[in-house]
């Protein structure tokens, strides 16, 4: 069986429900999906209203034994995961298998920091929300309802960005050196280039 290509999505700047709906569909179709930077996901509506909604959800519990559920996740990645779960038939084998194909992370941990990350235009806030509309960040909401790792995630993200800057500078320098080297040997290999062109090996 062919290896299923992993779809790596950058959650920053996407709307929670719209992104969750698209991810839910993809995992049901058999794609493996990884969503990074879940703390940067947006929720439409002002922050205060969203916080009140989440605090109301925190009050939902089993009176006789709260440890039996419902479970209230505090991390942005788990809040997003639960949103996707609500859009899947997760109590069936098919739904459970689909949910197993989804991975969610706060920040961008290795090896995904070295991979190309994609966006979903249909779920982007700048595309779907009017500029005047209010919105909230999932990371801030999570922090105010009990997520303890906002500062840790922010520090790790800063370190990752610094590393990425250094890597990009080196890459640019290598490209520049390669171009310079090609220019330097261009005249020396002219006669060989002509021979290769006559044989149709170079266009």
Curated annotation (Swiss-Prot):
It comes from the Eukaryota. SUPFAM superfamilies: Ribosomal protein L13. It holds the Pfam family Ribosomal_L13. PROSITE patterns: RIBOSOMAL_L13. GO terms for cellular component: cytosolic large ribosomal subunit; GAIT complex. One of its GO terms (molecular function) is mRNA binding. Phosphorylation at Ser-77 upon interferon-gamma treatment in macrophages involves a DAPK1-DAPK3 kinase cascade and is causing release from the ribosome, association with the GAIT complex and subsequent involvement in transcript-selective translation inhibition. The modification N-acetylalanine is found at residue 2. Its main location: cytoplasm. This is Large ribosomal subunit protein uL13. It comes from Pongo abelii. The gene is RPL13A.
């Amino acid at each position: 069986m062919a290896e299923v290509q992993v779809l790596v999505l950058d959650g920053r700047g996407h709307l929670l429900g719209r992104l969750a709906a698209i991810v839910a569909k993809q995992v049901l179709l058999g794609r493996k999906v990884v969503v990074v930077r879940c703390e940067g996901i947006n929720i439409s509506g002002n922050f205060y209203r969203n916080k009140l909604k989440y605090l109301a959800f925190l009050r939902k519990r089993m009176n006789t034994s709260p440890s039996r559920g419902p479970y209230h996740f505090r991390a942005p990645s788990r809040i997003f995961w639960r949103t996707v779960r609500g859009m899947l038939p997760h109590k069936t084998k098919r739904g459970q298998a689909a949910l197993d194909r989804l991975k969610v992370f706060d920040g961008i941990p290795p090896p995904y920091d070295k991979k190309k990350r994609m966006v979903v235009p249909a779920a982007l806030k700048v595309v779907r929300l009017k500029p005047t509309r209010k919105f909230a960040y999932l990371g801030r909401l999570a922090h105010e309802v009990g997520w303890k790792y906002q500062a840790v995630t922010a520090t790790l993200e800063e370190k990752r960005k610094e590393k990425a800057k250094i890597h990009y500078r080196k890459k640019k320098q290598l490209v520049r050196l390669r171009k310079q080297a090609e220019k330097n040997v261009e005249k020396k290999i002219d006669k060989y280039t002509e021979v290769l062109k006559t044989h149709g090996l170079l266009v």
